[in-house]
Amino acid sequence: TFRDIFERGGEKNWKKILDLVRTDCRDVETMMEKVYLPEYEGGLFNGGAAQMERPNTFIIQQGRAAESVLMEIVKKILAARHPGKVFTIPSNGHFDTTEGNIKQMGSIPRNLYHKELLYQVPEGGKYEKNPFKGNMDIEKLEQLITAVGPENVPLVFTCITNNPICGQPVSMGNIREINRVAHKYNIPLIFDVARWAENCYFIKMNEEGYADKSIAEIATEMFSYCDGFCMSAKKDGHANMGGMVAFRDKGLFWQNFSDFNEDGTVKTDVGVLLKVKQISCYGNDSYGGMSGRDIMALAVGMYESCDFNYMHERVSQCEYLAQGFYKAGVKGVVLPAGGHAVYINMDEFFDGKRGHETFAGEGFSLELIR
């Protein structure tokens, strides 16, 4: 399923081997030939012997656990190579657990978003095109890397959509530029993609050159720019649980975090370290702590998120509610709405009369349900 959506370039190329499982195919030769034995390599999802020899895809039961597995192994490798060294990891907006995991590494998370963009609202509250307020500030990224030194930036993260910035989308052009800058300095680019399908929808609807492309086609291009990703699959996977860590086979992340002998052979494969952590903490790599039912629900849900009509209805509901608040005079409504929620700036709502120590947002929520 992940190969279909993130690597095969659209619905016309999908294999949908899920249907064999869903229809309870009992033909052993068919299942072995199409499901269990095919070998895939070179992308984000190795299969067959390649996944056994160079594991690069790891099912985990939820996103923050997947993130924790990744960051614990990264921490272990960096600590062994550079004891006591403090690293900096930039993002367009670290999710709170990402920021927490980075701090637990002893590293510094940096958020490089456009603060000045977030609360700008045009006359009447309507944008002709989404301004992609979730974009990373590319100039700040270049400045940060050169200021601290590229050797002190082990990873660049990109949160898609930008969860801390009110679920605002990230443009394909911005993703391409983040990739360019990161690779210029030999730094792997890691996506946090809990809401990948929403982001693809926003790109389709608002970015030049993508109107005629499907969500799945856009997803394939988007994922081509990353060296790895962490995912909570409970959002755009339509499932009760699920997550994943994956990195590109023999790509920049693998090169930077594996150890090699003098003759170039692999001494320690970072994928093996991740697999050991996955199995020891969450479950065998065939299920990662998830039930068969949840794995099937996730596989079905991933395809469902590629349905334009579904995604259009979902995102439109958020915009409808946000516009309703704005027209009713509610202060601080963030416009345009993201794809999963409506956000209100509590500083503006309370006219700056509430300090952060008063937990204005929590108080506001309590008043709504009192």
What are the functions of these language-model segments?
Residues G332-R370:
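Conserved PLP-binding catalytic core of the aspartate aminotransferase-like
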